[in-house]
Amino acid sequence: MPKDDVIKMEGTITEARRNATFLVELDNGHKILAQISGRMRKNFIRLFPGDRVVVELSIYDLTKGRIVYRKKLDRKGSDEGTGERS
């Protein structure tokens, strides 16, 4: 799929299903089914309910997506990568 045909959005994993499929609630309130990308499978990146993730959605089907990045949490519990230093 060309990179021009995807929409990147952030969300939170709400439910883990079988076969590396997750129910993700996006920041705009929509719920979608998302699978782990091949690169995340290859590197054994584990995902759990409550994790913040970046999801790529196809412009042709906005109900399914691919999880491409898991956001790390710092010790304070806020998102890392916000640009603020403590």
UniProtKB/Swiss-Prot annotation:
It comes from the Bacteria. GO terms for cellular component: cytosol. Its main location: cytoplasm. Keywords: Cytoplasm, Initiation factor, Protein biosynthesis, RNA-binding, rRNA-binding. Pfam families: eIF-1a. Belongs to the IF-1 family. This is Translation initiation factor IF-1. It comes from Pseudothermotoga lettingae (strain ATCC BAA-301 / DSM 14385 / NBRC 107922 / TMO). The gene is infA.
